[in-house]
Swiss-Prot record:
Top-level EC class: isomerase
EC number: 5.2.1.8
Source organism: Rhodopseudomonas palustris (strain BisA53)
Descriptive protein name: Trigger factor
PPIase FKBP-type domain sequence ranges: 171-256
Gene this chain is encoded by: tig
Matches recorded under PANTHER family: TRIGGER FACTOR CHAPERONE AND PEPTIDYL-PROLYL CIS/TRANS ISOMERASE, TRIGGER FACTOR-LIKE PROTEIN TIG, CHLOROPLASTIC
Amino acid sequence: MQVKETVTDGLKREFQVTLAVSDIGSQVDARLDELKDKVRLNGFRPGKVPLSHLKRTYGRSVTAEVLEKLIRETNDNIFTERGFRLATEPKITMPTEAKEVEDVLAGNADLNYTVAVEVVPEIQLVDFKTISVEKPVVEVGDSDVDDAIKRIVEANRGYDDKGEGATAASGDRVTVSFKGSIDGTPFDGGSAEGIPVVIGSGTFIPGFEDQLIGIAVGETRTIKATFPTNYATAELAGKAAEFETTATLVEAPKDTPADDEFAKTLGLESLDKLKEAARGRLAAEYAGVSRQRVKRALLDRLDEAHQFEAPATLVEQEFEALWRSIVGEMTSTGSTFESENTTEDAAKEEYRKIADRRVRLGLVLSEIGEKNKIQVTDDEVSRAVMERARQMPGREKEVWEFYRKTPEAVAQLRAPIFEDKVVDFILELATVTEKPVSKEELYKDDDADKSAA
């Protein structure tokens, strides 16, 4: 066997490999010798088939099998001896000329092929003890709890029929049936019956609810409203529509005091217990947002400390996935690059930077996990699957079966668990300073942290 490195370009490597005909032949003979006790050929007793006859009958297929094994083992040796960590699957280029291929399969010539790969660069990890991050901390105030209780009351308040002839006011709940059209033509999803609408809740498209003020039971109105430009259904985004709307019930909100009796309707002993639960839920919510802030800050520090060339193929794959997502979202919302105050070229440049960052951070986190033996346990994966199953009541068995049969989906569950475990490991060594902030400061620019890696 001969190996010659022919390309060294950044992280790209290519090798010219020659497998000697003698090495190929000896392995073919060994494989045929294994087969002679297993094959059954007319005219020969078991185990007595001459090697020459076996070679005439099975030589080409066995040679192909041996070559596949030799190429795989040779490539593995090339990469292992050089300490390569592969970023991509090896790309193998075999002979294409018919005579050369025939000579190799006939056992009359060496096999010459090339193998090209892209490798992961050697990563020098920063000393995690030199990393400092701030942890924003929000104290749950009494006013926060009071606001939460108000929201709970609003979400659980009852309504009373206002009676015959009464008209709807802001805050009332009106049950309506409507038929929507655009330019006189009905559209999919534009008609419904028996839909409760709380005037002022903002759950319907802008302008719809306000035009219900003053409506009475049995009254029909033509409500004109325009779908937002970022509406989820692209075909409707920005379109002006008319809804022939009939009210079938008008109800006023009940006066629902936040007291012990109200708390009991929610299964709690008292208002104090409800406040305690609300405080705990807010504390958990703030802690979750704070965690994302800390994680983002830590990833920023890791990004700054590990500036290296990322494998171009991985960056391109990440960019393509990102770009498909962006284009799909823009299509569904009807937005354009112009409406987002950018251009396609500028957006692509920005998302290529994001893709490069994600790939580098992924490699860094993987390196940290490997060097510190951080692993995701089967129990952790099972808990993640259980959580997914709980989110789909009635389809739990289907969810379990899906993950049992889909290794790629399990890998997608493992990835964020692994990332969080590595982050926790680093934070144990880094300097984390708590910084008291307001609720508004905690949530400021929250969208920027949703793609932390």
